[in-house]
Amino acid sequence: KSTLIRHLNRLIEPTSGEILVEGTNVMSLNKQELIEFRRRKMSMVFQRFGLFPHKTVIQNVAYGLEMRDISQDERNKISMEKIEAVGLNGFENQYPNQLSGGMQQRVGLARALATDSDIMLMDEAFSALDPLIRSDMQKQLLSLQSELKKTIVFITHDLDESLRLGNHIAILNAGKLVQVGTPVDIVMNPADDYVAA
């Protein structure tokens, strides 16, 4: 699953096939076009947060904007909006090691939101969190999604989580796609014993 999501933005180079995003074949992009594509079209939230330990919360959130040469005033304005959106107002000057795991994951989410990319890739983003924080993050993601209407590719090994968060689910088993459908389709018409289990 993690390998698949890294193929979507070519963090891992696929050996064959096409990756189509809004009619653009990501496989055909040269290095500079790929950099621009990643900056503008996709953002990623990692399982292990992926935060810079030497940067404050606001600096971490602003990082993608800095890479786009957005002015510091505008970066800070956008970053504070996203920090507030994920419930971390008042923590903008803290460093990652001063935050709980759930708070660090919120910083990662705020950073992904700050770039306003069309597609968010979330790789096991909540799996390292304890169950209560995980449930809270799921609620927050659903709330943000209803407001922002972003495409989110959410990788999880937890079927319950996928059923709660997804409106279109793809199930992989041993690297093979075994079923694609809505949560109701998956539950009511499992493709095989693996999906039914």
Question: Model-predicted segments: where are they?
Answer:
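Conserved ABC ATPase signature
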Residues: Y95-L99, M103
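Conserved ABC ATPase "signature" region
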Residues: T24-N25, A62, E66-D69, D73-F91, ...
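ABC ATPase "signature
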Residues: V180-G181, N189
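Short coil-to-helix segment of the ABC ATPase nucleotide-binding domain corresponding to the Q-loop/switch region
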Residues: K55-Y63
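Helix-to-loop junction immediately C-terminal to a conserved catalytic motif
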Residues: N9
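A short, proline-enriched helix->beta-strand linker immediately N-terminal to the Walker B motif
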Residues: A114-D118
